[in-house]
């Protein structure tokens, strides 16, 4: 199957919730994909095919997953790519020496951390999360990878809120598997 065929099938599994978590957002719940092992495999295979096609001849050393939903598929994707998995967590959740990045949220700031020895310098990394909205958390993960002198090949997302233009903040190109939400819901 092609990535497009996989994406069509995966999109059919999403559940939609208008005006959640706030007015104007159509929340698309991708958790039903994980209830069906065949759909979960297709999700991983879609990202694997995309990355292998785009980065032919280049080894992806690590998949970096953002807390918490990047943890749902990041480790499986890392295994499929024969790469390591490295988590980015909220402040205070990782042991040992960490580096941190601050990012803006709707009502203040938050901090992401990564273990300082988790990625050797010049490693090729891909950063994954379920969705990109404003881009703050993804950019913070990119900042962490760059602090460790990693080479960010790409950011990969299952979904995107295009109208928030979050990908414009990122330090590398991005790929969104399922079509995004191009505009806010009308009120």
Curated annotation (Swiss-Prot):
As one GO molecular function, the record gives: metal ion binding
Pathway listed: Purine metabolism; AMP biosynthesis via salvage pathway; AMP from adenine: step 1/1
**Keywords (A to Z) from UniProt:** Cytoplasm, Glycosyltransferase, Magnesium, Metal-binding, Nucleus, Purine salvage, Transferase
Judging by the UniProt lineage, the source's domain of life is Eukaryota
Pfam families in the cross-refs: Pribosyltran
User: Does the keyword Metal-binding feature in the UniProt annotation?
Assistant: yes
Enzyme Commission number? 2.4.2.7
Query: Matching PROSITE patterns, A to Z?
Result: PUR_PYR_PR_TRANSFER
Which protein is depicted?
Answer: Adenine phosphoribosyltransferase
Species of provenance: Kluyveromyces lactis (strain ATCC 8585 / CBS 2359 / DSM 70799 / NBRC 1267 / NRRL Y-1140 / WM37)
